[in-house]
Amino acid sequence: MEHTNSNDSAVNGTAQPQVPFEVFKALPKTDLHVHLDGSLRLETILELAKAEKVELPANDIEGLRAAIGCGSNFGSLVEYLRGFDITLRVMQTEAALERIAFELAEDAHRENVRYMEVRYAPMLHTQRGLKLTKVVEAVLDGLRRARETYGIKATVIICGIRNISAESSYQMAELAVAYKGRGVVGFDLAGAEADFPAKHHRAAFQLVRDNNINCTIHAGEAYGPESIAQAIHVCGAHRIGHGCRLREDGDLMQYLNDHRVPLECCPSSNVQTGAVKDLASHPLKLYFDLGLRVTVNTDNRLITDTSVSKELYLVHTQMGVPFADIKSMILAGFKSSFQPFHEKQAALRRVGVELDKYDDHGVLLTSQNGTSSERSSRRPRGSAELVADAE
C-alpha cells in the first residue's frame, strides 16, 4: 500500500502539533531531482571565479546571492533558469566539476541524505574545450570521493536540453549509454518546456531504452498535462519531473497512478517558477491522497535556497501533510530510485527500521542508548507495507 489516510487538522478540525525541523534533518532521505549546476556553494563560485579569472556580476556573497536570485519568486521557468548563466561560468574545468560534485554530496550528507541522483547536461560544461568524457568523469570522481569520505551514495542522470537540439540530446544519450554501470543511472530531458516538446527528442530516448537505461523527463512544470502524456507515451519516461499540471487531466493521472509512475515533486522551486501560486495550492498533497507515488526533492539547492529537510518541513507545515505520510514519501523516494532492485530492497529495509523509531507525531520511540521506550510497541503506519513492496 502506497500511503496512509492520515487525517490532518484541516480534515478533523483538531490542531496537530508541528514536528520540529530538526527531526526532518535527522531522518534518512533521498534527493532524486537535483541539478548540479543549480546546487553550488556561493563561496565556491567566488573562489573558483577568482582562481580562474572569471567575471561575475558581484564579488561578495550577498551581491552574488542577489544576482542569482537565490530563493526568489521569478514568476516563470525562463527567468528562473537565468541564474544558471552565472553558475556555469565556473563549471568549465575538471577540477571545478570534481569539487562541486563532491561539495553537493557533502552538503546532502550533512542533512542525512543517503542516496541522491545528480543530474546535469555535460555539453554545458564544454565552453572552454573540455571533452564530454572528461566532464562526466570529473563529476563521477567527485561523487565517488564523497562516498568514500561520507558513505553517501550519489549517482548521475545525464540530461539533454529541450531548447538546444535533438542532435545534442542524442549525443548526451550516447554518453549515458557509454557510462551505464559506471555511475550513470539515467537520462533526462530538461530546459525550457513551452515550445520545445519532448517528442522532438524521441530518438535519444529510444537509444537509452534500447540499452535498458532508466529515463525521467521534466514535464507538466511550465506546460500542460499533454507534456506529461508525451513524456510517458512517446518517450517512455519511467518518472516525471515536477508534474504540477497533471491534476488537469484526471484520466492521465489515473494512468500514472495505475502504473506507479513516480512524481519528482520540488515544491519550493515550483512556487519560484510560477508553476503554482504558493505552497498551499501545490498539488503534492492531492496526488498523495489519491495514491500516486510522490517523492520530495530540492531541484536546485542554491537557486531555490533549499534542502531536502526544508522541503519536507514545508510539506508538513505549509501543506498540512501529516508526519506519518511524510515517512511514506521518504520511503517512496528510495523505492522510486534508479538503483538496482536488490540495493533498493536493502535500503528500504534499513530506512524502514529507522523511520519506525518515530511515532506518527515525530516523537522518537527509542532512547539514545538503543533501549525501547514503553511507547515503542506502537508501530508507525505505512513503513512495513512500503518496505515489503519495493517494486
Predicted regions and their residues:
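Metal-cofactor-binding active-site regions of metalloenzymes
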Residues: 2-213, 222-227, 234-239, 245-262, ...
